[in-house]
Amino acid sequence: MEKFLKPNKAVILLQGKYAGRKAVIVRAFDEGTRDRPYGHCLVAGISRYPKKVIRKDSAKKAGKKSRVKAFIKLVNYNHIMPTRYTLDEDLKDVVKDVVNADVLQARDKKVTARRTKARLAERFKTGKNRWFFTKLRF
């Protein structure tokens, strides 16, 4: 069977705190690991989407509305829905030191999420991957 859950593939999370949020696969663990003996992947996604900016908004308000908040998480394959989209932004170097689950603890996770946030915010401001930065309507 061909592996289609590859890095840079956009997915939608189906379960948990970030259900309904869009994310991108950073690294896939098809065979599982010792801690998680099932197929899972490391995803980086958007926990708070940027709001729509209108013409009459001041520069300060427009800046606040275009903020992006990111997260990183290990997710079971059963809890994601792949989409046809891919992000050409490679986030692998942002989370290069993430090899196992114990690296994803509170402090390191926050630092990595902050670096991911900066990368995604830059992507949003350039106007690329517009679909990824819009809230999913359902």
From Swiss-Prot:
InterPro entries: Ribosomal_eL27 (IPR001141), Ribosomal_eL27_CS (IPR018262), Ribosomal_eL27_KOW (IPR041991), Ribosomal_eL27_sf (IPR038655), Translation_prot_SH3-like_sf (IPR008991). The keyword rRNA-binding does not apply. SUPFAM superfamilies: Translation proteins SH3-like domain (SSF50104). Keywords: Ribonucleoprotein, Ribosomal protein. One of its GO terms (molecular function) is structural constituent of ribosome. GO terms for cellular component: cytosolic large ribosomal subunit. It comes from the Eukaryota. The keyword Ribosomal protein applies. Signal peptide: none annotated. Pfam families: Ribosomal_L27e. One of its GO terms (biological process) is translation. PANTHER family: 60S RIBOSOMAL PROTEIN L27. Belongs to the eukaryotic ribosomal protein eL27 family. This is Large ribosomal subunit protein eL27.
